[in-house]
Design a protein with these regions (language model features):
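Residue-level recognition of well-ordered beta-strand positions that form the cores
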Residues: 51-53, 74, 114, 186-188, ...
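Contiguous beta-strand segments within globular domains
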Residues: 41-58, 180-184
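Sec-dependent bacterial lipoprotein signal peptides
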Residues: 1-24
Length: 223
C-alpha cells in the first residue's frame, strides 16, 4: 500500500508540474500575441500631420505676420475620395502648431487648404463622403452679371505618405500661397478728354475665370 501511494503521489506531482508548465507556456504565447497586436494597433493609429506655412506671391514666409486669419483643410484618402474637413484657427497658424489627421486604411492622403474665403464674395463646394477631389472648387459670386472682387485667398496642396519605419508622427509642411493680388488704377486727363467732370466712371476687367479648381487653377466660364 505504501508503494502504491508513493507511486500515485508521484504521478499526481508530475501531472501538476506538467499542467503548470503548460499554463506558463500558454501565458507567454498570449503575451507575445497581445504585444504584437498592440504594436500593430499603435502603428495604425499614428496620424498624418501638417504644419501650415503662409507665403506671399513673392515666395516670402508671412506665417507670423497675421495676414492669414484661418484656413480650411479638405482631406482626401488614397483613392481621392473626400474623407473630412478640418477648420484651423489663426493661432494655430501663427504658432506653427502641427495639425494631426487620422485617416484609417490609407497609406497616402491629399490635403488641400483654402484660406480667406468670404461668403459674400465666393462660394466653396459643400463636400460630403459622396464627393471626390475633382469636385472641390471655389467660385466667384456675381452681382448683375459682374463677378465680385475676390477676397485675399490663399491655397495649398500636399500629398502625405505614411511612414511605416517609425511609430512617431512626422509633421509635413503645407505651404499656402496667396492667389489674389491688389492693384490700383489711375487715369489722368479724363475730364479734359470728355470735356466734363460729371458722371460716374468705373473700370471693368474682362476675361476673368469664374472659378478655381482643386489644383488652384482658373476654370469655368469667363466673367
Amino acid at each position: 500500500m505504501k508503494k502504491g501511494n508513493f507511486f500515485a503521489n508521484c504521478v499526481f506531482a508530475v501531472s501538476v508540474i506538467f499542467t503548470v508548465l503548460s499554463f506558463s507556456a500558454c501565458t507567454d504565447d498570449s503575451n507575445d500575441v497581445v504585444a504584437t497586436t498592440s504594436e500593430v494597433i499603435e502603428q495604425a493609429e499614428v496620424p498624418f500631420s501638417v504644419v501650415l506655412k503662409a507665403m506671399n506671391s513673392d515666395g516670402n514666409d508671412i506665417t507670423t505676420k497675421g495676414e492669414v486669419n484661418g484656413a480650411t483643410l479638405f482631406v482626401f484618402d488614397q483613392n481621392n475620395d473626400f474623407f473630412e474637413q478640418i477648420n484651423v484657427n489663426k493661432s494655430t497658424i501663427l504658432s506653427r502648431r502641427a495639425i494631426d489627421i487620422n485617416c484609417p486604411n490609407s497609406n497616402d492622403i491629399t490635403v488641400i487648404a483654402w484660406s480667406g474665403i468670404n461668403s459674400g464674395n465666393e462660394e466653396i463646394s459643400n463636400m460630403s463622403k459622396a464627393n471626390i477631389i475633382s469636385d472641390l472648387q471655389v467660385s466667384l459670386k456675381e452681382n448683375n452679371g459682374i463677378a465680385n472682387i475676390p477676397s485675399d485667398l490663399f491655397y495649398g496642396q500636399v500629398t502625405l505618405h505614411k511612414n511605416s519605419s517609425t511609430k512617431s508622427t512626422v509633421s509635413n509642411e503645407l505651404q499656402i500661397i496667396r492667389k489674389t493680388s491688389i492693384f490700383q488704377l489711375s487715369t489722368k486727363g479724363l475730364i479734359k478728354y470728355l470735356g466734363s467732370n460729371a458722371g460716374n466712371f468705373e473700370y471693368r476687367i474682362k476675361n476673368t475665370k469664374s472659378s478655381l479648381d482643386y489644383n488652384g487653377n482658373p476654370t469655368g466660364e469667363e466673367v
